[in-house]
Design a protein with these regions (language model features):
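Phosphate-binding site of ATP-dependent enzymes
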Residues: 101-190
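Conserved N-proximal alpha/beta basic substrate-recognition cap immediately N-terminal to
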Residues: 1-67, 71-73
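Structural detector of well-ordered beta-strand residues that form the stable sheet scaffold
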Residues: 6, 34-35, 61, 85, ...
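ATP-grasp fold ATP-binding core
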Residues: 53-54, 79-97, 118-133
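Short amphipathic alpha-helix with an adjacent loop that forms part of the alpha/beta core around
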Residues: 2, 73-79, 112
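Short acidic/polar capping segments at secondary-structure boundaries
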Residues: 39-41, 67-71, 89-93, 103-106, ...
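Basic phosphate/pyrophosphate-binding loop/patch that engages nucleotide-derived ligands
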Residues: 52-60, 78, 103, 113-116
Length: 190
């Protein structure tokens, strides 16, 4: 309460301590002003927000959310032997995230691990452009583009990280009018 403002920057361990983070966040938000808005921070903790964005007309990677091992097996089978990205819906730093063949033992093992701990698993088809490092992040402040980065590829096909370690390689990029329009539409949908 002795602070005028709290800016949340990098709470990288929140996925391992969700309940503790939420309790702390509720206490702090009751005592001081928080950026971003507390409701937005809570909404953003779980990547199931992607389904809400899709319902609002925003293009997202097709995603199946599963909470049981039977549903995970069915979701993986629907992809045959294609490459898929698997990850918990509450995650950061690509923890328990992998790019694997849908019919591989690694896919079943990761699905089991995520679901057994009570988390929701996301199953997404590989988007080759993203696997090649073309994912972009556009940062808007008060609705205006501040800057953009190409995030770089992280996941090695077959599991693990490229080069064996989690290493982000962001590069500042110039955006297209189409990318800015998409970012603005996404913010408006939130």
């Amino acid at each position: 309460s002795s602070y005028d403002l709290l800016v949340i920057r990098s709470p990288w361990d929140y996925p391992r301590r969700v309940a503790e983070f939420e309790e702390w966040f509720d206490r702090v938000a009751a005592m001081t002003r928080v950026l971003n808005e507390p409701a937005l921070v809570r909404w953003n903790l779980d990547k199931r927000y992607l389904a809400q964005l899709a319902e609002r007309g925003i293009g997202v990677v097709p995603t199946t959310y599963v909470a049981t091992t039977d549903d995970a097996s069915a979701a993986l089978a629907a992809h045959g032997d294609a490459w898929v990205v698997l990850k918990p819906s509450v995650s950061a730093g690509s923890h328990d995230t992998a790019l694997v063949r849908a019919d591989s033992p690694e896919a079943e093992e990761l699905a089991q691990r995520v679901i057994t701990r009570g988390a929701t698993l996301m199953v997404q088809p590989e988007i080759p452009e993203l696997s090649q490092g073309a994912e972009r992040a556009l940062y808007l402040i008060d609705g205006q583009l501040a800057h953009a980065i190409a995030k770089g590829a992280l996941l090695e096909r077959g599991g693990g990280f490229i080069g064996g370690v989690y290493q982000e390689t962001p590069q500042v990029v110039t955006t297209t009018a189409e990318e800015v329009a998409f970012a603005e539409a996404t913010v408006a949908a939130v």
